[in-house]
Amino acid sequence: MSYFPWLTIIVVFPISAGSSIFFLPHRGNKVVRWYTICICLLELLLTTYAFCYHFQLDDPLIQLEEDYKWINILDFHWRLGIDGLSIGPTLLTGFITTLATLAAWPVTRDSQLFHFLMLAMYSGQIGSFSSRDLLLFFIMWELELIPVYLLLSMWGGKKRLYSATKFILYTAGGSIFLLMGVPGMGLYGSNEPTLNLETSANRSYPAALEIIFYFGFFIAYAVKSPIIPLHTWLPDTHGEAHYSTCMLLAGILLKMGAYGLVRINMELLPHAHSIFSPWLMIVGTIQIIYAASTSPGQPNFKKRIAYSSVSHMGFTIIGIASITDMGLNGAILQIISHGFIGAALFFLAGTSYDRIGLVYLDEMGGIAIPMPKIFTMFSSFSMASLALPGMSGFFAELVVFFGIITSTKYLLMPKILITFVMAIGMILTPIYSLSMLRQMFYGYKLFNVTNSYFVDSGPRELFVSICIFLPVIGIGIYPDFVLSLSVEKIEAILSNYLHKSFS
């Protein structure tokens, strides 16, 4: 038990400090922007300090643990803790949110509310990754839905209200299943209800009940991840949202579903996970092919990038379904890797849109010469997305491949078939990535457009791009930087899983 409440401060600080934005003097938007960036930087430094000096990498147990009784009648505790599974996504959240606030610099309309909503999302996302109580996990899971809805409906494109409504219907609909499952697990088999994750993990449930719980939780995570066929909100949301919101969606929000799948479904419901994992493997494989095949047909380049996110999340699902330490480590590496790459692609898509005012690829062409910096960064991140060796995407997908091949759960022929289909998906990725680059940056089309605002990337935009590009290269060259965070915890999860599923 931690004596100093590091995690409570880390979770509460963004939203509480963000509340005082409304009391700042109305002297333009610069004060609000700098205040928000300072909060994000301070939060990131605080998180990094706490994890560097108070987190032991070789300890698979929960660390920095805090437990405060909150609502007695429900046995509801403010229970927080960090382990190897959650430290990576938590640091990713801090990094991407800080850069997203810098990316949101051009936002001038209602900037106080805009920046407050971004900070509220920050608290909700870190709270989700560090919760050790099922009800607290659900509250934090829901906390970031309202900010996304408002950010989308107030600062989105022409169809923003349609996209925002679709987003809230899908995510709130999925959360109903989460809400039903949480008290069900808490109340089952005990005179005193408990929502503690550790206590729930040590319980055993009847097979039929475990399958019902698993399926309910899975629907909630399938919407958020997203997993087909519950993915259709994502292209519409990305197509209309402001690019700083897209960075948070692609970089962090989608990863919460995959995290919940391991944290709740695999750790708490191992028998059901053993039954569902072959189906997860099939769904993940179909998802890679389906999204990679659908992406080239999207005329809107933001929707094309959104479908690439759906395809890449298929690798994460397959890694989780492989039930091997290599597959799970690959899934976590893919979560971190795609968090950087997805956020960068949407940021660059947004900066391109700011300049040319076009989203349809058939109207674009020839912007490489007037905007060489944007072209260079867009090309670099597209290469990372198609898993070029030396970049983070390559190693993440390679580790997932080896995870399937070394899995003892599946027979040889299904493993060969799945790896073959995954390989086809990896071949399809360059097709939509490179064709998007060709349509946007090559040719002469836009040279004929009069009064075009052709200004290349400024220092702020270049800084954001380089800040994301460095970890993409760093992880590609030295993936142990990320794998060392989770390897001990993954071993512990698998040993507990195998012990419980065969007992």
Swiss-Prot record:
Presence of keyword Glycoprotein: no
Topology in the lipid bilayer: Multi-pass membrane protein
Principal place of residence: plastid
Location comes to:
Plastid, Chloroplast thylakoid membrane
GO molecular function list: NADH dehydrogenase (ubiquinone) activity; ubiquinone binding
A GO biological-process term? electron transport coupled proton transport
Domain of life per record: Eukaryota
Pfam families in UniProt: Proton_antipo_M
Tell me what this protein is called.
Answer: NAD(P)H-quinone oxidoreductase chain 4, chloroplastic
What organism does the UniProt record list as the source?
A: Drimys granadensis
* Signal peptide segment: none
Transmembrane residues, as ranges? 4-24, 37-57, 87-107, 134-154, 167-187, 208-228, 242-262, 272-292, 305-325, 330-350, 386-406, 416-436, 462-482
Q: Which GO terms describe its cellular component?
A: chloroplast thylakoid membrane
Which reaction(s) are listed as its catalytic activity? a plastoquinone + NADH + (n+1) H(+)(in) = a plastoquinol + NAD(+) + n H(+)(out); a plastoquinone + NADPH + (n+1) H(+)(in) = a plastoquinol + NADP(+) + n H(+)(out)
> Keywords of this protein's UniProt record, alphabetized?
Chloroplast, Membrane, NAD, NADP, Plastid, Plastoquinone, Quinone, Thylakoid, Translocase, Transmembrane, Transmembrane helix
Protein family according to the UniProt entry: Belongs to the complex I subunit 4 family.
Q: What is its EC number?
A: 7.1.1.-
Q: What class of enzyme is it?
A: translocase
Q: Which InterPro entries match?
A: NADH_Q_OxRdtase_chain4, NADH_Q_OxRdtase_chainM/4, NADH_UbQ_OxRdtase, ND/Mrp_TM
